[in-house]
Regions:
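Short Lys/Arg-rich cationic patches that frequently serve as NLS/NoLS or arginine-rich RNA/DNA-binding motifs
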Residues: 2-29, 33
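Short solvent-exposed loop/turn micro-motifs enriched in small/polar/acidic residues
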Residues: 65, 143-147, 179
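Short, solvent-exposed loop/turn segments at secondary-structure junctions
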Residues: 85-87, 122, 166-168
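Short, charged/polar "capping" segments at the starts of alpha-helices
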Residues: 122-128
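Structural recognition of alpha->loop->beta junctions
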Residues: 130-146
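Short beta-strand scaffold segments in enzyme catalytic cores
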Residues: 151-154, 186
Length: 224
């Protein structure tokens, strides 16, 4: 089963919660691409080189699939996804299609650290697909925060997407131009852009806003 998020291993199966925070921080520090500050382990992405300002790509509508989803397939070490809504999403596979979850499962098997923040539980089709990929139970961590409305994807802490598109077929997925949502976003490898996106994601991930949150009654399993 997809299961409820827990703060320890979910022995009944389902999407894995966050694992030990310290081990995650240690792995990131060892990778040498991030700096860790203060008790909330705020992370700053540090690309290997400073790209030119021209490396900002404006993405609209169907280009989200080609520029964002296809980039997910190329991740080597770290993938962070923040979305308000999450539904079953399919990607091209030769002449057919397959669930994005299969792509994420393949990444997890290769040791990619996958983090997912979402505002509400996924739909039933997504949950049914999830059960087919046991590698995600251990290989993908998640937190649920009902205040999340940002759409942020950080690729290997070297590139980031920030925009309007949710992790859905009509948002980032491969739905046709006449049925998909009208979306807009920015994809960039700019050092400051990636750092700011990663910091906002990590602040929510580490529960930096939980202490003063006034919506705790809507949060079934607080992050912090």
């Amino acid at each position: 089963m997809f299961g409820k998020k827990k703060k320890i291993k979910d022995t009944k199966g389902g999407m894995s919660p966050r694992s030990n925070r310290e081990s995650v921080k240690t792995r990131a520090a060892a990778a040498g691409r991030v700096r860790i500050h203060h008790q909330n382990a705020q992370r700053q992405a540090m690309p290997d080189s400073t790209p030119s300002p021209s490396e900002f790509l404006y993405i609209s509508n169907g280009a989200h699939y080609d520029q964002v989803i296809e980039r997910i397939k190329t991740v080597k070490k770290t993938l962070w996804i923040g979305t308000a809504d999450i539904k079953d999403l399919y990607v091209k596979d030769g002449r057919g299609t397959k669930p994005l979850l299969e792509v994420l499962s393949d990444l997890a098997k290769r040791g990619v650290e996958i983090r997912l923040i979402h505002a509400k539980e996924p739909g039933p089709a997504f949950r049914q697909d999830f059960d087919k990929y046991p590698a995600l139970i251990e290989g993908m961590e998640r937190v649920l925060c009902p205040r999340v409305h940002f759409k942020i994807i950080v690729f290997d802490l070297k590139a980031a997407y920030v925009g309007s598109a949710n992790l859905t077929g009509a948002g980032l997925g491969m739905k046709g131009e006449n049925t998909r949502n009208f979306e807009a976003g920015i994809l960039s490898t700019n050092r400051d852009f990636v750092k700011n996106a990663a910091e906002q994601f990590d602040n929510v991930w580490m529960g930096a806003h939980c202490k003063g949150c006034k919506r705790k009654e809507f949060c079934g399993d607080p992050i912090g």
